[in-house]
From Swiss-Prot:
InterPro entries: Ribosomal_uS15, Ribosomal_uS15_bac-type, uS15_NS1_RNA-bd_sf. This is Small ribosomal subunit protein uS15c. GO terms for cellular component: chloroplast; ribonucleoprotein complex; ribosome. Pfam families: Ribosomal_S15. It comes from Manihot esculenta (Cassava). PANTHER family: RIBOSOMAL PROTEIN S15, BACTERIAL AND ORGANELLAR, SMALL RIBOSOMAL SUBUNIT PROTEIN US15M. GO terms for molecular function: structural constituent of ribosome.
Amino acid sequence: MVKNSFISVISQEEKDENKGSVEFQIVSFTNKIRRLTSHFELHRKDYLSQRGLRKILGKRQRLLSYLAKKNRVRYKELISRLDIRESKTR
């Protein structure tokens, strides 16, 4: 599997920017999630990787909720560019 096929244009644009920014972390978590979901198409019973996927999903969800609280405009722009669903508010 080629890692570069999962790295989006957004990740390339933000490579020069701050790697500690919330947006960059969300993009990198999204790339990891997409890589793991394609891995599960072949390896359905890889339970340790499924646990890792759930952990990454939780981290991304926490970062998305933080970004939604701090800057709603950047949050909306990021989820539209990454093509992910908006989180449900409680």
